[in-house]
């Protein structure tokens, strides 16, 4: 595997084990089948809002923690998510998740979605996505588009569970931009961009 560059290293995202709560490195994570027997824990309420200047600093930290950088490849382009509008999810006055987006044509593009590992599996990402959908409806946009990578099985699961449909696979899109093949979720090589859509 080629040497990782500073700009496009392996995704440093940290996941939390749903059974024991231990933090797991992205590349070391595994997919497994589990039932819903775990008791549901009531979580503190989530407030989702447009990011303020103070929120943007926290959002940048979340994106850096999740992606290792704020410049990412999405929709076939290299994008700087720091320059995009963002929604933040706040729990106990602390940002626990962030969603960067752009408006283009009749669609809202979800460019990046990051959740603090402490709040994974607590609904933060779902609240952010629901707010993005409300924003698109208020703006009378007809659809939301999402771009992710072939290795990102958690994202593919999440978006499809929320009504998004696979619409396009762009082979080697990420590899062509990064000029390398990096290991992604569970060691799956990151190569392709996968696009999903939800019509409103």
Regions found by a protein language model. Give the residues of each.
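Conserved GNAT acetyl-CoA-binding A-motif
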Residues: 136-148
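Short, non-ligating residues that shape and space the ligands of small metal-coordination modules
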Residues: 26-27, 43
